Amino acid sequence: MSLQFIGLQRRDVVALVNFLRHLTQKPDVDLEAHPKILKKCGEKRLHRRTVLFNELMLWLGYYRELRFHNPDLSSVLEEFEVRCAAVARRGYTYPFGDRGKARDHLAVLDRTEFDTDVRHDAEIVERALVSAVILAKMSVRETLVTAIGQTEPIAFVHLKDTEVQRIEENLEGVRRNMFCAKPLDLNLDRHANTALVNAVNKLVYTGRLIMNVRRSWEELERKCLARIQERCKLLVKELRMCLSFDSNYCRNILKHAVENGDSADTLLELLIEDFDIYVDSFPQSAHTFLGARSPSLEFDDDANLLSLGGGSAFSSVPKKHVPTQPLDGWSWIASPWKGHKPFRFEAHGSLAPAAEAHAARSAAVGYYDEEEKRRERQKRVDDEVVQREKQQLKAWEERQQNLQQRQQQPPPPTRKPGASRRLFGSSADEDDDDDDDDEKNIFTPIKKPGTSGKGAASGGGVSSIFSGLLSSGSQKPTSGPLNIPQQQQRHAAFSLVSPQVTKASPGRVRRDSAWDVRPLTETRGDLFSGDEDSDSSDGYPPNRQDPRFTDTLVDITDTETSAKPPVTTAYKFEQPTLTFGAGVNVPAGAGAAILTPTPVNPSTAPAPAPTPTFAGTQTPVNGNSPWAPTAPLPGDMNPANWPRERAWALKNPHLAYNPFRMPTTSTASQNTVSTTPRRPSTPRAAVTQTASRDAADEVWALRDQTAESPVEDSEEEDDDSSDTGSVVSLGHTTPSSDYNNDVISPPSQTPEQSTPSRIRKAKLSSPMTTTSTSQKPVLGKRVATPHASARAQTVTSTPVQGRLEKQVSGTPSTVPATLLQPQPASSKTTSSRNVTSGAGTSSASSARQPSASASVLSPTEDDVVSPATSPLSMLSSASPSPAKSAPPSPVKGRGSRVGVPSLKPTLGGKAVVGRPPSVPVSGSAPGRLSGSSRAASTTPTYPAVTTVYPPSSTAKSSVSNAPPVASPSILKPGASAALQSRRSTGIAAVGSPVKSTTGMKTVAFDLSSPQKSGTGPQPGSAGMGGAKTPSDAVQNILQKIEKIKNTEE
């Protein structure tokens, strides 16, 4: 709050303000001790009323500044109490002559303490000092004052006069300026005096310091209140004769009583707040032509002019208006202006023109001195300065207004508000801005990734992690069970999930979860799914179930066509899946069960079967675990009811490809035995590609589209992140070949172990055995999958021995529940580490162990689209003699990637997790499952689909237990080129539309030509001996299937 002065020049106002600002640094803080400051209130050149107002404003500001710097004597008072106690302690031990009188003064010192009222401080200090001085004089036997009504003066005892003078000067300085007490450099501990006298002298100095500060402060406070009240009374009397509204308004403000500091501050606030209302009642100059703001002055000024001028020009003024006596002791002749001339007026009270006023004043006064000229020049200079400052202020306000307007304007259209720079890769036009439409500039909740792929292909195959967030926020959803308002869509809660522990592996961390955006809700409904935000550009296909949050096997077939409730099977991971090369993922232990199924509907599921494990023990499934099954999806979430999602894979097959994998090359090929491997490894598989891409596209074009599943990234795991005791790597081979190499040289054994690395092609086999300890998997990055035009294949892993013919086996993605028979508890799979150093092979230590341990992989969403990653099961290729193994020779042809365990719906809308159940092979009991197979029950009930899988190289690995069932074929004529003229066995999975729990049957057939094979069809298979070419063999197979179908109907 700044002070307001009227009619003062700039330098005068600055002088007044600086005095108040540096008041505590002045030698004397009394305002009346600075007469020059009081004269700057306009005493010499302003109207008396204006001078009084400026003085009132100065005293109010001065009093406020004094109270703001009110000295705090708390520490000094505490010191005084301590010194009083010291004097009393020494006084009780001193041998006074008059013990009774001394005892009374000691009691005064003992009772010395200060209350909360500071007004009593000086009185308490004075009483204590008088008693202390009397005790000191009694100790030195000095004469005391004995007169009635007189008290002992407070003085120092036994000190030199020079020392006393220095002490008095210091105390006087404290009295003049109580805000700054200078320390006294004087030693009061004199050796000639006793301890009691020295303690009394110190107490006297401290007490007098307190008394000077308190009493000088009280004196200044009383003076300020008196001067403020005096100025207020004078101004009220000055304004009493005024008849204007502003004068009466100011007079009413001044009538507020000022009794203390709070009331003084209230008066100051009122005067400053309404300054613009009454300012015109105070003239700013003593002459009209020097800048008087008010043209109406009261008659008392006219009376004063009459008394001074004595001219005939004012003879017409009525006599009753002329005051005959001075008011309140004021002498109009000896006015406070001290010779300054008041305003000049006409007889009728109106202002005269400038020339007439100048002539009248010259005639009345008789002089026009140089001082008036100097003041006029100064006034003009001041006016110019004021005008220049006003112009600068106006220009500054305009600039500030322009800046505010520019800040309020919307941002330029070149950069969208919600646009963010891509973190992984750039767009096709080589700029950092997002290429989405205008409606995709608001962050909205992630929906379940499922609908058409219009925006999915806009990224050019790059899966931006934030592209899923950019969806339409300006339109309302048109589909789904609920339609929530637009405001709720825009303000939906989200949280960026940091690397966290997954359900599948509580002790390990997901590598890609740091960029995963999850809603803060428990489930993902269709709240935000609609036609306007139906694109899926986050790398996942448009499936109604997000594989990142789906951990159950759910039957999503149409419930109206099912005779019984669908079976929901939940699995839990027991072993990690390792990533090798270009995305070939196999379990970390060959011959071990990966998933444990738990049928939800016991009526439609087979009898409970023991869960095969490494050691042959049974691991029951806890129903309260987080892997418990969930209810079937509603109809609006069924992929069968969303035709746009089903066609997503055909339009956007490149989105299934992971562009962020970093291929590494390794030139070393080793096969060593290591007891503590750095990473669990699995044998590389021999792969075969048997058809052209054009034909394969026609074969696999109409397959259903599903979502991609999370896989486990063991490549980026740390050395200590995996259990080294669970899987022991006996050898790992990394090929050092080019991309199109056909044959890979056999591995050479060196005493050095190599770690898995990403390679684009894997075409070799290495021996491996596993221990009986299971591992927990780790969900990792999405695995890169090839283009949809690749060829379906089968991967088998067997120990390498001599030279035999190629052995490739395959199974359909879904097997009837009737073919899944539990393995008896007596058949336990055991393993041991048996390595032959010379040949690089491993043999089974038990006769019941399968000769070749294979890992069964389930199809991923990319596998359904791409034949190169079709859902194939690496069944155990059991030979007739368990003691011998059938090692395959190196396979020719380009290698490809294999499917990975999945958590999403697959063929025909059936959700399959992990590997599909294996099929009993020849050489094993019908009711037995090998250690590498999985016990699970599924209920496929969907429209009939005929799927021809790649052939197997041996007839013994074919399936011949299921009765043949015919079904309409969906193969086109061009699909005949998909099969090569090789001696192999294929499996046809036939889906039946009948309402039964076993709607899928398997038909095995032999594709071998009689001219090349030299033998007839294998037992238990559909012989196609009459076919001369592979195309004829396919046609014969389809005709036989049609015939069987018609017969069944």
Curated annotation (Swiss-Prot):
Keyword set, alphabetical order: Glycoprotein, Host cytoplasm, Host nucleus, Host-virus interaction, Phosphoprotein, Virion, Virion tegument
GO cellular component: host cell cytoplasm; host cell nucleus; viral capsid; viral tegument
PTM annotation: Phosphorylated by host CCNA2.
Biased composition (Acidic residues): 428-439, 710-722
Function: Participates in the last steps of viral maturation and release. Associates with nuclear capsids prior to DNA encapsidation and later preserves the integrity of nucleocapsids through secondary envelopment at the assembly compartment. Interacts with host CCNA2 and thereby blocks the onset of lytic gene expression to promote establishment of a quiescent state of infection in undifferentiated cells.
Subunit structure: Interacts with host BICD1 and RAB6A. Interacts with small capsid protein UL48A; this interaction links together the capsid and pp150. Interacts with host CCNA2.
Protein name: Tegument protein pp150
Species: Human cytomegalovirus (strain Merlin)
